[in-house]
Amino acid sequence: MPIAYKNINQLWAYIFTETLKRLGLAYAVICPGSRSTPLAVAFAQQAPNIEAISILDERSAAFFALGIAKATNRPVAIVCTSGTAGANFYPAVIEAQESRVPLLLLTADRPPELRDCHSGQTIDQMKLYGSYPNWQAELALPVSDMGMLAYLRQTLVHSWYRMQAPTPGPVHLNIPFRDPLAPIPDGTDLSYLLAKFHPEEFFAGITDTTPLPHHSPLSIPPEWLQSQRGIIIAGVAQPQQPQEYCRAIARLSQTLQWPVLAEGLSPVRNYADFNPYLISTYDLILRNQQLATRLAPDMVIQIGDMPTSKELRNWIDTHQPRRWVIDPSDQNLDPLHGRTTHLRIRVEELGYQGVEEDKSSVSEYLQLWCNAETKVRVNVDETLDKMEDLVECKAAWLLSQMLPPETPLFIANSMPVRDVEFFWKPNNLRVRSHFNRGANGIDGTLSTALGISHRQQSSVLITGDLALLHDTNGFLIRNKFVGHLTIILINNNGGGIFEMLPIAKFEPPFEEFFGTPQDIDFAQLCTTYNVQHELIHSWVHLQQRLNPLPNTGIRVLELRTNRKIDAQWRRDNLSNFAADNII
């Protein structure tokens, strides 16, 4: 063995990290603290196989780990000390569960005899995250026994599996340690144990063999083939293999001759050449009530989560079509509680044996959708192309055309995700979009984006000012971060999304409690964190900064907008793009 083990905690932590290394763990985020010392030291000693990244703030660290897991589609471990430290992981744990991301939460704890007696930095850490983990357990105290070392190894093997199957999500292990925590002698004679411990024999067969759920191909239901008034909704999705995912949706669309209403947060819009029946302006089309009635479907296939659009949701709720949801998770993805059947498979697992694509003429219903898309798309593009003022909605439209191919993009919640849904233009850039749409919070925005960008291609974050301010501790990661992140900051000095809600008409209390202007000088803020800042003066200026992107560092490109003008622009235009589009 590479290390002379001086106490049982050190050996226990070695077994712990060595097992995870052999299972395939590549990243461990470590928050500073005393009780977690054995794990921190052991993870550090696993370099370069495991990159151990030290991050001060636990909430930020958890979202950074979440971002890495999203980008790599692999589990990431995060370690903290005892007490309230682990409570700061909670928002990221919720997001990991709701968006199905594998995270391994490792909370160090005091031994049982130091609990419930005011020993200090001790809280009840059992089931700290409620029902959100896929699985959770408290480990036994370290013991110098071969049987217990095998127990530790197999508990980690089981944890690795439960993070990824049957549905990805977080796993929480609470890990008590007695003193001494540092690798110093504790008087225990480990020689007899180490004489029986042969690492290659002990770890034999420990590899990343997590079985991916596999289903026999599901035959296309006959009723789908018989309907000419069906639609496919490509909803919010971050598939591991976006190209295969988009090809599968395109094949289904062309087989059924149904249009694909593709969310801006679906990769389908970034692989537009695959799908001739792609509808990107459905939210705008459905604001024309007469046209929306003519387009009412008999059947709907929803792939992944329901899109954000309230127009789409209300339209489906009004017409109550027969619906199917295709998604392998065990979650209920129908917030409308309609006549819905959940097919627990991936869209790639649909079977086409004996089914031929319909090569006949396009149905009147499909043609109606395609004509509407063409006209509304032209209206949107012409309007935004002529726009010279810095109105925030144009940023999403511009990004969809200007980013380097395959750029990782993190889209913050509130208005950015909605502007992407409204205005993201179909393209063939294969942009890799990421987002926290599990619980839809603004917390952890910057840290998640940095995690997604770490050791990846130069990346972009589009965010509002409040979402960025909510997570400025993420800038503390800058010295650990490897790669580049450009932050497109839409600074409208407050919560622009609330300007679109009925409460905006009530002043007071609107500005104080909903608009919440913070009046922050972002140039000064960036100076504090030693982050590059540039004020963007025009759309041409922004385009010049987007392609190519730098290779290293973090920079903020700030667009100052007026949220009341932005809101008025939306009120004036969103319902008009399809107003004269009655076919």
UniProtKB/Swiss-Prot annotation:
One of its GO terms (molecular function) is magnesium ion binding. Transmembrane segments: none annotated. Its cofactor is Mg(2+); Mn(2+); thiamine diphosphate. It catalyses: isochorismate + 2-oxoglutarate + H(+) = 5-enolpyruvoyl-6-hydroxy-2-succinyl-cyclohex-3-ene-1-carboxylate + CO2. Binds 1 thiamine pyrophosphate per subunit. GO terms for biological process: menaquinone biosynthetic process; phylloquinone biosynthetic process. Homodimer. Belongs to the TPP enzyme family. MenD subfamily. Catalyzes the thiamine diphosphate-dependent decarboxylation of 2-oxoglutarate and the subsequent addition of the resulting succinic semialdehyde-thiamine pyrophosphate anion to isochorismate to yield 2-succinyl-5-enolpyruvyl-6-hydroxy-3-cyclohexene-1-carboxylate (SEPHCHC). This is 2-succinyl-5-enolpyruvyl-6-hydroxy-3-cyclohexene-1-carboxylate synthase.
